[in-house]
Amino acid sequence: MKKLLTIVLMLVCSHVFAQDSLKSFNNTRINTTSSGMEILGGWGALNLATGAIAWPNSTSPEARYFFKMNTIWGAVNFGTGLLTYASLQKQRKKHFTAAETLKEQQRIEKIFLINGYLDVAYIGTGLYLKIVGDSRHSPIMKGYGESVLLQGGFLLLFDGLMYKAEKGNGTKLRTFLEKHPITFDGRRVGIVFNM
C-alpha cells in the first residue's frame, strides 16, 4: 500500500510540476510574441502618422510615393500587430497540454522564419523598383522602391530577432519535454521510460 501511495503521490507531484512548467513556457511564448506585436504595431502607427502627414504635404513626387507606400505598410503592420496581440491575450486563459504547447511553439517559430524569407523578397523587390526607377526616371518606382526597401529592412530585423527569441524558447521547451516525459491529457496519465 505504501508503494502504491508513493507512486500516486509522485505522479500527482510530477503532473503539477509539469503543468506549472508548461504554463510558464506558454506565458513566455505569449509574452515574447505580445511584446513583438507591440513593437510591430508601434512601427505601423509611426508609419501611418508620418505617412498621413507627409504624403499630402510632399513637394517631390518621389517623396509623395514614398510616404504613400509607407502609409499603406503602416496600416498593414498596425493591423497585424493589433489583431495578433488581441488573439494572444485570449490564449492567456487557455490551458495547453504538452502536445499543444509544442505545436504552438513550432507554429510561431515557423511563422517568423517564413516571414524572414518574405522580408528578403521585399528587400529584393524594393531594390529592383529603385534601380529601375532611377534608370527610367520614374518617381513612382523610386518612391515605392525606397519605401519597400525600408519596410523590408525593418521587417527582416524584426522577424530575425523574433525568430531568435522564439527559437530559444522552443529549445528550452524541447529540452524540458525530453527530461520530463510524463504526460497528462485530463483523463490519462502516461510515463515514458527510455531504454
Predicted regions and their residues:
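Loop-to-helix transition at the N-terminal end of transmembrane alpha-helices
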Residues: 61-77
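Long, highly hydrophobic alpha-helical transmembrane signal-anchor segments
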Residues: 40-66
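Helical transmembrane-bundle signal
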Residues: 44-54, 74-84, 122-126, 152-162
